[in-house]
């Protein structure tokens, strides 16, 4: 086992990364090794997808499968070895299918096929022990390269994982693009070559950022086409009397299905974690039994799910061990999510979840409501732009802070709470992702009617924040980096990595990230990123605020 992809990975003087019997996320060594082998097989699929495309051979099922299966290897997504092995076998089938089509096309045109070694030819064993014996071939830190090359490879790999997740979220909402799929395969195949060219790897990281910008636009289109544009909305964060289902993750299509199937059954539906922004979409407001948001960010789920008196559905990341809170008999996984022994819902029938919710006691009484405001995504931000601009021009608003990203359980993450509390009263705070839970229940007031806290949405809604920044740049006729805007991002996993790459690829500079630097990036790489982009780690609130406000 070697895994260094998330913020909570083990860090020691001898080296970074989880490399024992179990990772910090709870992932067993066997699961980690199978995930590496799955990635290895997917690189083989992509290598032949690239070659097949030279002859006009495109398979939409394969274009869908590769990012979806890749998504299963993100932090806190799939811990089920058997399902991961099934993905690997399917990858082998698809690879060989493309290989055969490519060879036939070459033969038809009288050219010699260029075969792919390694990922292009490995045949998986037929049992789990034998498959695990094959896993060392796919070990991510194999090959004896220096820490800079390894770090750049992993930056690209983990960034592409984040992009794959957003591709799958977009696909669920009927948003696909053959050119995006082609670019994805090209990068995936390149990463399978284990390049030692630092310049090429760095350029690839920027290409991944640009690719993800297109993918986030697709996802934005899918969400707004399906559910309308989010509107500023008051949301209750307390319990409501009655039977209950909690929907966590990111998949709004699943939420819609659950709402449709629970209508009239006396079941209240709550969002959790990154599903909170769903409550701002017009399409969901017709469901009176979508009553609010319960709980906070992913890392608190073992306590929150244990006390939630209903059924829980994990539509995507992040899942952590449900046996700790003894609720594994009433939590259900969807799509690429998996945990051994937890019921996985196939298809679109949620009747088992509904029946479980009806069996359980539900909430006995209504708590006193506590309301928060959400829904400041792209359209709402653009609608507010003239008022915001006027307040900037008259000096009422002097600075913007984007404080968001992933949450986690390290005490150092209180930095983001303290920062939000400490920004000047003439500042606006934009937030997104589950990092918002560090401060989204606080009252920040308003500036001449403009709320000082604007919840933009899920982590992928960084796209909306980017659109606002680009609009303000044009209005004020200045460079993007000359806006009175500071970005402070909390990161935890691979979606945050690809959002960061997207911002860097767009030329955004002087971003601060925390609470720690990615363990896969060497000190030298961090220095290079600081020199080129002004990217730096968070320190303490007072010092960082002074620097961001250009106060000596």
Curated annotation (Swiss-Prot):
Annotated compartments: Cytoplasm
Obligatory cofactor(s): [2Fe-2S] cluster; hybrid [4Fe-2O-2S] cluster
Major place of residence: cytoplasm
EC number: 1.7.99.1
Reaction(s) catalysed by this chain's protein: A + NH4(+) + H2O = hydroxylamine + AH2 + H(+)
Record-linked SUPFAM superfamilies: Prismane protein-like
Modified residues (Cysteine persulfide): 406
GO CC terms in record: cytoplasm
InterPro entries, sorted: HCP/CODH, Hydroxylam_reduct, Prismane-like_a/b-sand, Prismane-like_sf, Prismane_a-bundle
Database matches in Gene3D superfamilies: 1.20.1270.20, 3.40.50.2030
Domain of life where this protein originates: Bacteria
Cofactor note text: Binds 1 [2Fe-2S] cluster. Binds 1 hybrid [4Fe-2O-2S] cluster.
Keyword line: 2Fe-2S, Cytoplasm, Iron, Iron-sulfur, Metal-binding, Oxidoreductase
GO biological process: response to hydrogen peroxide
Binding site for [2Fe-2S] cluster: 3, 6, 18, 25
GO molecular function terms attached to this record: 2 iron, 2 sulfur cluster binding; hydroxylamine reductase activity; metal ion binding; peroxidase activity
UniProt-listed Pfam families: Prismane
Annotated positions binding hybrid [4Fe-2O-2S] cluster: 250, 274, 318, 406, 434, 459, 493, 495
Family assignment from sequence similarity: Belongs to the HCP family.
PANTHER family linked: HYDROXYLAMINE REDUCTASE
Entry-linked NCBIfam families: hybrid_clust, PRK05290.1
Functional summary from the UniProt entry: Catalyzes the reduction of hydroxylamine to form NH(3) and H(2)O.
Protein name per the record: Hydroxylamine reductase
Organism: Shewanella frigidimarina (strain NCIMB 400)
Protein encoded by which gene: hcp
């Amino acid at each position: 086992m070697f895994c260094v992809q998330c913020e909570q990975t083990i860090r020691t003087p001898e080296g970074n990364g989880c490399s024992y019997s179990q990772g910090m996320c709870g992932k067993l060594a066997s699961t980690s090794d199978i995930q590496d082998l799955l990635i290895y097989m997917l690189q083989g699929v992509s290598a032949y997808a690239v070659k097949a495309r030279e002859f006009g051979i495109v398979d939409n099922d394969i274009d869908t499968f590769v990012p979806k299966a890749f998504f299963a290897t993100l932090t806190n997504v799939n811990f089920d070895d058997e399902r991961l092995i099934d993905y690997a076998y399917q990858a082998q089938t698809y690879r060989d299918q493309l290989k055969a089509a490519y060879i036939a096309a070459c033969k038809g045109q009288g050219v010699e096929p260029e075969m792919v070694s390694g990922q292009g030819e490995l045949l998986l064993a037929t049992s789990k022990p034998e498959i695990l014996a094959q896993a060392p071939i796919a070990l991510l830190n194999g090959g004896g390269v220096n820490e800079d090359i390894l770090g750049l490879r992993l930056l690209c790999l983990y960034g592409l994982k984040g992009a794959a997740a957003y591709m799958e979220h977009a696909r669920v909402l009927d948003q696909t693009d053959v050119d995006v799929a082609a670019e994805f395969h090209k990068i995936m195949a390149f990463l399978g070559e284990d390049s030692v060219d630092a310049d090429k790897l760095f350029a690839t990281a920027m290409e991944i950022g640009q690719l993800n910008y297109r993918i986030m636009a697709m996802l934005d289109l899918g969400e707004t086409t399906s559910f309308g544009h989010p509107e500023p909305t008051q949301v209750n964060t307390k319990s409501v009397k009655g039977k209950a289902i909690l929907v966590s993750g990111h998949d709004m299509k699943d939420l819609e299905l659950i709402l449709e199937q629970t209508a009239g059954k006396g079941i209240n539906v709550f969002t959790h974690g990154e599903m909170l922004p769903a409550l701002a979409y017009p399409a969901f407001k017709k469901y009176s039994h979508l009553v609010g948001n319960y709980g906070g960010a992913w890392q608190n789920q073992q306590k929150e799910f244990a006390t939630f008196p209903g059924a829980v559905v994990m539509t995507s990341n992040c899942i952590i061990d449900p046996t700790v809170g003894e609720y594994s008999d009433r939590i259900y996984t969807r799509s690429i999510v998996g945990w051994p022994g937890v019921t996985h819902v196939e298809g679109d029938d949620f009747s088992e979840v509904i029946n479980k919710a009806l069996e359980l006691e539900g909430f006995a009484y209504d708590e006193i409501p506590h309301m928060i405001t959400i829904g400041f995504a792209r359209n709402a931000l653009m609608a507010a732009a003239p008022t915001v601009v006027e307040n900037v021009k008259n000096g009422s608003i002097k600075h913007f802070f984007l404080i968001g990203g992933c949450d986690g359980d390290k005490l150092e993450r209180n930095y983001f709470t303290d920062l939000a509390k400490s920004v000047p009263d003439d500042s606006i705070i934009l937030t997104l992702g589950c990092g918002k839970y560090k401060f989204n229940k606080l009252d920040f007031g308003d500036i001449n009617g403009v709320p000082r806290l604007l919840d933009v949405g899920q982590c992928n809604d960084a796209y909306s924040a980017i659109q606002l920044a680009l609009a303000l740049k044009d209005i004020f006729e200045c460079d993007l980096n000359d806006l009175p805007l500071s970005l402070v991002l909390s990161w935890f996993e691979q979606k945050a990595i690809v959002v960061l790459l997207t911002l860097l690829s767009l030329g955004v500079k002087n971003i601060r990230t925390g609470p720690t630097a990615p363990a896969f990036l060497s000190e030298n790489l961090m220095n290079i990123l600081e020199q080129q982009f002004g990217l730096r780690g968070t320190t303490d609130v007072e010092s960082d605020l002074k620097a961001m406000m250009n106060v000596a």
